[in-house]
């Protein structure tokens, strides 16, 4: 069975040897004084290094005291929910969107209201209507403005400005999940919403090193105002006390000596080639052209393919009969179906992508609905 990812990196190209060497050095260096209980916010060395990293590369303006390390971005979302949301609070989220985030918010017994997404990103007019209707119960909005999940669209400049005005007027937190920031293929990436200095106290910036290095290394971070960080730290102490200090110190070394940045450049070039190969495959096969529509993304690790003439559930069934696993569009909506699916290209070689397209082509032929024998 071949599983088409929804947008994960290729773990086969992870910088394993540099990381292993850095971990050995970190373990030796920490043996005498650094292997006891530490700060729940994470290793101070990595927090300082990350602050410099995002300030330089992403236009933020933060210090180590405004950084909290987490176990991946999912850990960051859960930590935010438990620290900042009360039972009965409401948080707005993109729709279609990232369902694991919705579940994290509901873990804190908060209510999630869904805001539609179109070609310019979050429908800020709909968000504003929710804010007025809820009269103070709406506390935050969760967005993926750089590469919206799952549709891959980038939030337009006009929508970004409107979002800032809404959050300022209604005193909402912007929970910005900036996943896949490093993977931009067309020009310079947009700066995060959190780079806006006049809104920094209301911005909660979430990012992850897991997709940059390897998904199995659960290492994410939150950047927020110090008052928010204090609440995050208190809850983190109750959840799992602290992270993996040896891993955190090793990653700090890899960022400081430029290994992470070099790996990102190599990966970005490779993933761009894979994206282009997949787009060529989709464009050159008539059955795929007829059934699939796509707006080529300027970054990220997946395509959002809209279906014509077949439901995503039916395509998933046909693909499964041919030993191919796809995730239906319904995984990204609150209820019902969605005639689309994410095709993650980064984790597959060009040969593997061609083979997957062979299977998809077979699934979309007129007689493909018949049971395979």
Residue ranges, per PLM feature:
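N-terminal "arm"/small-domain region of PLP-dependent enzymes with the aminotransferase-like
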Residues: 1-41, 52, 321-325
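Conserved core segment of the aminotransferase class I/II
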Residues: 19, 199, 204-269
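Conserved core of the PLP fold type I
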Residues: 23, 28-170, 175, 182-200, ...
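A short, glycine/Asx- and small/polar-enriched loop/turn
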Residues: 74-75, 189, 299, 335-340
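Short hydrophobic/aromatic beta-strand micro-patches
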Residues: 223, 304-306, 344-346
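Conserved glycine-rich beta-strand-loop-beta hairpin in the small C-terminal domain of fold type I
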Residues: 252, 268-279, 291-306, 315
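Helix N-cap motif at beta-to-alpha junctions
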Residues: 308-312, 349-350
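PLP-dependent enzyme catalytic core of the Aspartate aminotransferase-like
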Residues: 321, 335-373
């Amino acid at each position: 069975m071949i599983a088409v990812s929804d947008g994960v990196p290729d773990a086969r190209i992870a910088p394993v040897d540099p990381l292993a060497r850095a971990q050995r050095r970190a373990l030796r260096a920490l043996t005498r004084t650094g292997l006891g209980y530490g700060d729940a916010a994470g290793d101070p060395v990595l927090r300082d290094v990350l602050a410099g990293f995002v300030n330089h590369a992403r236009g933020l303006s933060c210090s180590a005291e405004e950084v909290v390390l987490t176990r991946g971005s999912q850990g960051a979302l859960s930590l935010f929910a438990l620290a900042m949301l009360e039972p009965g609070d409401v948080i707005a989220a993109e729709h279609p969107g990232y369902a694991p985030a919705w579940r994290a918010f509901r873990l804190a017994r908060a209510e999630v209201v869904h805001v539609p997404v179109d070609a310019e990103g979050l429908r800020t007019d709909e968000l504003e209507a929710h804010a007025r209707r809820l009269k103070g119960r709406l506390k935050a909005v969760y967005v993926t403005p750089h590469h919206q999940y799952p549709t891959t669209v980038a939030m337009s400049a006009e929508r970004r400005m409107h979002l800032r005005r809404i959050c300022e007027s209604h005193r909402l937190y912007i929970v910005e999940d900036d996943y896949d920031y490093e993977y931009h293929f067309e020009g310079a990436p947009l700066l995060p919403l959190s780079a806006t200095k006049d809104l920094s106290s209301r911005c909660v910036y979430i990012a992850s090193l897991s997709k940059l290095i390897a998904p199995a290394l659960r290492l994410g971070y939150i950047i927020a105002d110090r008052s928010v960080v204090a609440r995050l730290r208190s809850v983190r102490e109750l959840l799992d006390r602290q992270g993996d200090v040896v891993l955190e110190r090793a990653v700090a070394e890899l960022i400081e000596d430029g290994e992470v940045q070099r790996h990102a450049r190599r990966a970005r070039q490779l993933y761009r080639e894979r994206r282009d190969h997949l787009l060529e495959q989709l464009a050159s096969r008539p059955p795929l052209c007829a059934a699939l529509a796509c707006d080529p993304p300027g970054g990220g690790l997946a395509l959002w393919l809209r279906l014509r003439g077949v439901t995503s559930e039916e395509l998933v069934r046909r693909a499964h009969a041919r030993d191919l696993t796809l995730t239906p569009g319904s995984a990204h909506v609150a209820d019902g179906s969605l005639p689309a699916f994410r095709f993650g290209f980064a984790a597959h070689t060009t040969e593997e992508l061609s083979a997957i397209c062979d299977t998809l082509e077979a699934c979309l032929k007129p007689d493909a609905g018949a049971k395979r024998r």
